[in-house]
């Protein structure tokens, strides 16, 4: 939390939490007076604007329950088609930042399961997974813009969405609009 307060004192305009689980989101928002956004919350909001149902590809089966709980706490339960975990190990996921072939294939397989469950938008539930899918290292010829869809269903770039939500909150704050309610804090 102190690092967030220091960032605010140093003149940063916003804070972006780049872990999909949105750790400490409410605590950071209560602690500073600059916009605090997270890739998880922003992605869920944006996905509901893109389609009626979204599916989430998670990095670990161990986190699926917590992910579903968070989706419901944010009020998006009715939009959730499902959550599936990639079959890649943590090591393979890290290697995807250098060679995304395995990550793309694993994501496509998960995405197809979610599409069968009704997903109209696919959400990678990790900033690092998103980086690998978007940059698509060693896959640039086949995916010049990264993995942007699976069988016609869009893959959300959670990092870009989070960044754009943060930029929007900064712009609105500079225009005089409050960026967060302090009532619940």
Give short role names for the model-derived ranges.
Residues 22-26, 43-44, 64-65, 130-133, ...:
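Short, well-ordered alpha-helical microsegments
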Residues 70-134:
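Active-site rim beta-loop-alpha module in soluble metabolic enzymes
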Residues 49-86, 102, 165-185:
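Short, glycine-/small-residue-rich phosphate/pyrophosphate-handling segment
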Residues 19, 126-127, 159:
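Short secondary-structure boundary segments
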Residues 1-46, 50, 56:
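Glycine/small-residue-rich loop that forms an oxyanion/phosphate-binding "nest" at active or ligand-binding sites
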